[in-house]
Each structure stands twice: as structure tokens, then as C-alpha cells.
Amino acid sequence: MGKYYCDYCDVFLVSESPSVRKAHNSGRNHLTNVRDYYSSLGHDKAQSYIDEITRMFETGGGNSTSNRGPGGNPPGSQPGPPNAGMSGPMRPPFSNSTAGPNMPPLPPAMLALMNGQNGMSSPGSGPPPMRFAGPPIPNNMPPGMMQPPHVNGYSSGPLPPQPQPASGGQGAPPLTARMNPDRARQLGLI
């Protein structure tokens, strides 16, 4: 027996995976049951539920006891642990804004090193500018693009000579004619 129960349809789903729930929630019978449930409430009560759900979504609010569908849970949701949604995950005491949203925060010592300081970093100071040592950017190459390796295995120096057709220009067209012009420019062939 599945772990997800649909209050509108009075059924347990086979799996609790999001794809199964999504398929169920877009099904004809489920949509009919939801429509029937809200039509039985009356327009004013259904509209107040919709407005409250919208407000909670826009403000990122947590569980509300007044917003309950059939079975005691908000429509389309699963029962969660107590105080679920009331606050975010626990953050370490040295939380800062230099880490990305899905990255753990950096400890103060790392921030001090990144800011080029020996001691503590000043509050509100952002990350230092990124500096990378590397070869200069070749002409006609966008930043971040590496120069392609050549046939001889080295990435600097001239390209090896291209073999010419043996029969006076007859045969396959040159490499640049068979290649996208932008790509040929990136490779330095044009």
C-alpha cells in the first residue's frame, strides 16, 4: 500500500514519487473530485480557501489550521512534521551571504582568508574579486573559452599545414568550407 493518500479521491497511491502524484493530480477522476468538493462548499467558502492558499504561497507562510481540506490537511498536500514550514533549516552560527543558496556557509576563518585579512572579516563585506592566473585570452575568443588543442598536442603556435588535394583543386572542399563560419573563427582558421 502506498504512502500518499488523496483526500479528494479517497485512495492510496501506489508510490509517493512526485511523478506518480503529478500523474494522479492531473487525472480526470481526481480533477472531477476536486471540482465536486469545492462546488459543495459554496462559492464564498471556496474563494476564501483559495485566497488563503494564495496568501500563504506568496508570503511563504507555514501551516495554518484554518486552511484545511478534507481529512484535515491543506488540499493537495501531505501531512508533515510538527512546525513544518514555520521556519527554515537550522543555520550554523557563522552563516553568511558569500555561499550560494545550496552551498554550506563558509566558516569565519575561510572568510578572513578570502578577504585577504589576517583576522576577522568585517560584517557585510562581500567575497573578494576572483582572480585567476592563466594564459591571455586569444583574439576572437570569448572570455572563459580555452584555445583548442592542435593536432601536435600543443595549444600554442601555428596550426600544422593542411594537406592540399592532389589533383589540382579537385576532391573534398577545404575544412573551412565544411565548417560553420563561427566555429572556424573560434578555432582561428579564418
Swiss-Prot record:
* Positions annotated as zinc finger (Matrin-type): 4-36
Per the record, where are the segments of Pro residues compositional bias?
Answer: 72-82, 125-141
Biased amino acid composition, Low complexity: 109-124
**Region described as Disordered: spans on this chain:** 57-190
What InterPro entries does UniProt report for this protein, alphabetically?
Matrin/U1-C_Znf_C2H2, Matrin/U1-like-C_Znf_C2H2, U1-CZ_Znf_C2H2, U1_snRNP-C, Znf_C2H2_sf
Q: Where is the composition biased (Basic and acidic residues)?
A: 180-190
- GO biological process: one example: spliceosomal snRNP assembly
Q: GO MF terms on file?
A: mRNA binding; pre-mRNA 5'-splice site binding; U1 snRNA binding; zinc ion binding
Which UniProt keywords are listed?
Answer: Metal-binding, Nucleus, Ribonucleoprotein, RNA-binding, Zinc, Zinc-finger
Q: How does it assemble?
A: U1 snRNP is composed of the 7 core Sm proteins B/B', D1, D2, D3, E, F and G that assemble in a heptameric protein ring on the Sm site of the small nuclear RNA to form the core snRNP, and at least 3 U1 snRNP-specific proteins U1-70K, U1-A and U1-C. U1-C interacts with U1 snRNA and the 5' splice-site region of the pre-mRNA.
User: HAMAP family in the record, alphabetically?
Assistant: U1_C
The record's annotation in PANTHER family points to: U1 SMALL NUCLEAR RIBONUCLEOPROTEIN C
**Protein name, as recorded:** U1 small nuclear ribonucleoprotein C-1
